[in-house]
């Protein structure tokens, strides 16, 4: 234990020393430099004070730099269960789920689209016989027939005459001419039947026959619903019926109501009715089920289904291994102060912290004890600092004391003097607090700054009151007393353009000469160069000569709106204005008669009407009175600084007239000129009426009018403007005058403007020394003179009382001065608050201290040797004026100085005495032109005597100046009509017209196309039972019928005599007994003797007869029954032909065809059975249900499979055609299937073709019992099978081998009950088994193999009652682990264990954590002050500041990519998306965020999806809106497509900034300033909102940079559509912040409309600012 304690003591001592050393360094560092001023901050460090109160919570600081990676902390405790996490990403697709339960049958679907044409239907019935057609045209004549048979002999004719016959000779006569045709013979016998001729043309249909008698009821046919036929044409109306005959009916007695007659014959068809179409009927009953349809083709794969319901929560996974430590996270943002945690373990020692902010000033501490004196070490003189800020204006100094004396020349600056002795330290008032010094004197004016940007247009000023009666001559007062010299003024306004004098050289300064004689008159000089510019508002230059006309200038840009000018003089009446807009409709006025023209009335008071239209240019008005000074003009060019004005010089000689110069700029209005010569009287003008209108356009020059008659003499006019100077007249005779009397001295005049610089005079004669004048006022500082020659070294002067000189070079060390008296002891300060435990960081430099009391002067030191010159010191402040020294001796005359300003004009001298009158001289030569005389006074002088005689004819003068514009001429003749103009652009659409009158109803339309077939209706309700028909005639006896169907079960017969019957059916299940308590396990028993067989149980009572069930599946073949009693003899069969001896007999007779059963639901395809019968396997676990396989080709007939589960309802298929009758199949074994659930009614399918004869199948497994189904619909009757041919008579056969057992015969009548059978033999004794343990219930096994065929029972029994509880199954598999349980209650502390064995020595441990602070040690002795440390080496460059991911988006509103503002980095460029509109709803983007800058452009940048997993793109009327460029829209206003869209879409840039960005808005036309600490990124206009199609749109947050667009446009965006077009539309509006005057804040806004050119005068300006980092 000892060594370890020693180590701890050493560590503690080192820590204390380190702590003391750092405290001392901190104390010393407080006041070591020279920057502490006069504060002495040394002192002994006081004891550690009490801990202060906790301060207020500070504001959240800026995010710090990313620190270095910290050490890995210990693993934390297990946390509480967290909040549920965000939904994870979508997992991989799971296996198909178990099929759900069949849903309820759906509602009937919407009728589908028309299917393809079906197969040809069954031929329809013969149509009715048509009516007889019209008679056809006669046929062509037939061919000639064959010769007929010879006719009968004719009657005997008369004897003929023989002409020219010699009797006795027989002469043969000539052949006679053919005779006439004989009469037709009688018809011959009919000939043999000829061959069948070709079919003739279809004859016309005959008339309808009478209705036949009702036929016999036919067999029930197969009904197929054919397609609905088209609606037939309307038939021709029939002939009118016969008129009825009127009969007289006598009213008889009331008859009794007769019996209901028999149903009459069907009537003839009636005429078509005229009823309206009825309402749709109610749905009928359900129709009969159709046949199964054909198998459809395999469908295309379906779309992915909707997500299933969430599954059950999975089991908890195993706990994973501990992960590696992640990288340190970014510093989090403090959202709120959490609850105080428990005190943590002491951390590792931290690095030195950064310098903290300067803390608040503490209360003054207790004064420390004085420290030892420091060693004075003079510091190096620093380089000159930058000029300080301009100080405030100092107080005016005291007037200087002056002794008279001549002023000597300025001497050269002497060499720097030795430094003075050091002063005594100043006394403090006890509170060591540095106060700022007094304000310094005013510094010299700074360098002029860069010219500022052009300012915004000023706001319109208030209208000024006009000064109606102002005489400016009377307003000017007498001159005031001389004021003190003013500050140097700003440059004045530019003066009128003066003549420029030639610059003279600087001459030597001459002595004043005596008064010279007046010189001769010189020649007029040439026109001078322009002179220096000066400005005096009291002087106005003469009007310049008119110039040559200049070239027409280029058209200027549209200027900003100017300020309102002074009201002009009233103009003459203007021409009528242009047609105004259509006003509101006024009330109708009465028609007045035109009045006669009245006299011109006196001028009325000024009206307050609207500003009239622009009038023609008026004639020149009378000169106005001088106006009040105007508003300051625009900022002029920088003026040249000129000397202050001197007194006016003597008037110069007049120059000769120059050439006509160019026209000068328009001058400022001149002051009124001297009175001119009396002008001719002017005509009296018409008095003006109304306020002056704006100047009208320049009218066309009129034709010169005819000369008018001379006017009446007018009244005397006002003085005219001064005339232009005329050419010089001829030289007059010299006048003779007397000198006038001495005038009184005049009132001092207003100071004149400085005269022009005079010519250099020659050197004058030196004057006598004047008397010493009084001291003059301080003159302005002259320019520096040239350096003088080095004078001899003067004797040392009396020490002046002046300001301290510049710091000289350091002198050698002088002897130490005597100590000054101690300072006044300060008052005791307030006790300070206890300080913190550790020394704080070095504070900032304190403010300047109060000056201490001046110490007594020390003894002067010995003069030091000349030191090396020091660096120039900081210039000292300007000293106060010193006391004047005694006058020195006059110096030798210096070189000529710069000529002084011209002196003020001297007073008039006294007049000299008049001389005697001389003799008259000879007439001299004609003299030169004399100086112009002073203007004569016009007081009390007779104007008549002043007029001279008429002079000689003058020479022709030079061309006079251009005259003023003439007055308006008479109107000219009308011009030629102009050519037709081009057609204008279409106008705006007119207003909506009134609704028109209803039109005449149109003619009926053509019949519409055939409608599509309606959906299959539900079957109708059954119709009412028809009336019994008339009994038909007696039919012929029928053939013997087929064997009848099995009859109903007859009543029980009397007991028969016969063999005892079989045991009865199994009785009903008895009720289950109560479970017994389990017995104890018995001993193994010994083998018992075989028991007796039990007696058969009693027969159960017969159940009540149930409803007839639906036919079940055929049962298994029953055991061969005992021979029954003899049956009734059958009907005699037909005799067969004798047959040959047959082989082994075939299977029994073909059964009767059964009636169609209800179509069952289709079972799933069964697996092929195993051959043979195996041993039963172990029960397997229940497998998952497999997915349904594709439909295969039809296989061979398999063995019957397990009945399938209940299928879902299929869709209704079309009825299939009737199949051929199949071949008889072989008898198979049947299993009694379960009773199936009632399936939904399916469509009848096509009957399959007969398959090949399959082998007999194995007996099937017993199916699961289904739920009881509802009774099905009755099936349609099947078609009767064909009757077989009768066989031949067979020979008696040989005894054949026994045939296969025939099919089960019909059930015979019940037999007589039998006797009891004999007792069977006892069975063999079984082996005794071991008793097994009780197992857990097992899982349900697969169904076992089929048992042996059971006896066939006719009626399936009802289900029995539940049996007794079976034995327990085997132990099941282990279940999955259960869910995590709730956290248990903390257990109690266990008992301590036994002590363990002592372990081996452990490895040395790691360095322990910092222990708690020890108690403070005793106070140490003060150490000596340490020396100053060396300056540290330059630190490494700091890490660059991290951008904190502040994003800002800038839009150029042009096709150029914008630049990111300074201080930000580009991330990417894109296209400026403003908002999108889908499904008539808009969603906007904030233009200041990155979402408004899409990397790619499309007129339809989005698609839309629905819940059916279907998405559509560019398929309907959706829009997108983009910021646009100034590209003008095409003149055709057609939509823009393709590449032509590119110039219309604005580009944008997404930039990353190092700090927050926001927008500020001024709500004026001035650009707002960024807040303190923020810098500007760009300026713009305040954009708030936008809408377009359907009045939908969005807006910008005013704090976002997106609300400050750099360009103002009334249509800043363009609309694009999914069909690939873009355009501007009239329903697009943009909304901007307006300007608001402070005085208009809570008043009703004044409505106004701004036209193009003045839109920006009411839009607020804005600036986007970024916080400085």
From Swiss-Prot:
Q: Which GO terms describe its cellular component?
A: basement membrane; collagen trimer; collagen-containing extracellular matrix; extracellular space
**Residue stretches of biased makeup (Gly residues):** 347-356, 586-595, 758-767, 797-817, 1011-1020, 1290-1299
Q: Which PROSITE patterns match?
A: NC1_IV
The signal peptide annotation in the UniProt record is 1-27
Q: Which protein are we looking at?
A: Collagen alpha-1(IV) chain
Record's compositionally biased regions (Pro residues): 196-214, 367-376, 413-424, 436-448, 1247-1258, 1413-1428
SMART domains assigned to the protein according to its UniProt record, in alphabetical order = C4 (SM00111)
In terms of SUPFAM superfamilies, this protein maps to: C-type lectin-like (SSF56436)
Which lineage? Eukaryota, Metazoa, Chordata, Craniata, Vertebrata
Q: Where is the S-Lysyl-methionine sulfilimine (Met-Lys) (interchain with K-1651) crosslink found in the sequence?
A: 1533
Alphabetized UniProt keyword annotations: Basement membrane, Collagen, Disulfide bond, Extracellular matrix, Hydroxylation, Repeat, Secreted, Signal
Comp. bias intervals (Basic and acidic residues):
254-263, 289-298, 497-508, 535-545, 937-955
Q: Which Cys pairs are S-S linked?
A: 1460-1551, 1493-1548, 1505-1511, 1570-1665, 1604-1662, 1616-1622
Q: Which residues form the propeptide?
A: 28-172
- Which species is this record about? Bos taurus
Where is it chiefly localized? secreted
The UniProt subunit note reads as follows:
There are six type IV collagen isoforms, alpha 1(IV)-alpha 6(IV), each of which can form a triple helix structure with 2 other chains to generate type IV collagen network. Interacts with EFEMP2.
* Cross-link for S-Lysyl-methionine sulfilimine (Lys-Met) (interchain with M-1533), residue positions: 1651
Let me see what the UniProt entry remarks about domains.
Answer: Alpha chains of type IV collagen have a non-collagenous domain (NC1) at their C-terminus, frequent interruptions of the G-X-Y repeats in the long central triple-helical domain (which may cause flexibility in the triple helix), and a short N-terminal triple-helical 7S domain. NC1 domain mediates hexamerization of alpha chains of type IV collagen.
Entry annotated with the keyword Disulfide bond:
yes
Function of the molecule: Type IV collagen is the major structural component of glomerular basement membranes (GBM), forming a 'chicken-wire' meshwork together with laminins, proteoglycans and entactin/nidogen.
Q: Which InterPro entries match?
A: Collagen (IPR008160), Collagen_IV_NC (IPR001442), Collagen_IV_NC_sf (IPR036954), Collagen_superfamily (IPR050149), CTDL_fold (IPR016187)
What PTMs does it carry? Lysines at the third position of the tripeptide repeating unit (G-X-Y) are hydroxylated in all cases. The modified lysines can be O-glycosylated.
Please give one Pfam family short name: Collagen
Question: Taking every annotated instance into account, which residue ranges of this chain make up the domain Collagen IV NC1?
Answer: 1445-1669
Q: Where is the composition biased (Low complexity)?
A: 357-366, 396-412, 485-494, 847-871, 1030-1040, 1101-1114, 1193-1212
Q: Which family is it part of?
A: Belongs to the type IV collagen family.
